[in-house]
Amino acid sequence: MFINHKHKFIFIHIPKNAGTSIRNSFDIQGYDKRVVRKPYPHNSCSEIKTYCGDLTWETFYKFAVVRNPYDRIVSYYHFHKSPQYRFPALANKYTFSDWLKRGMEDNIKRTQSDYLDIKINQIGKFETLQKDFDLFCNLINIPSYTLPKYNVSKHEHWETYYSDEDKKIVYGIFQEDFDRFGFAI
């Protein structure tokens, strides 16, 4: 998450949803921000509210980005295969299907809905990121700009990774996200 006191907004950074691009874009544009990494860089709304206090939470504009869970999990899979991950050799020994069944860590199974456990002002979608970011900038009265891309994994469209069984596994874990955010099954 990060908090910008000058423009009075809070960004809830959900993993694998372009959060690094959004956070770094504010650095590039010179916007003051305070990055909060307690207890970890990806906090739920209730954790952020506890950290920043009721007054800040109630008066600041709050936004987040969600992503189709099928696509998000493919992104996680490729991240785990990259040198950035602490155990890439472990992830590289699994096919996508095997990784879903045996290699996916519990923290990956945390739903996006869990991060957004308190109502916020705006939920954008990864699939329409620039359009939603432009709206956010307009609402907080700052000029919009093209978001840079960071940590982009190169892979085929998510649909090519999934068997019917794989889709059932992911849907079973993330059903709340599919329902709440209107993603197709």
Model regions and ranges:
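Membrane-interface amphipathic segments in extracytoplasmic regions
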Residues: 1-185
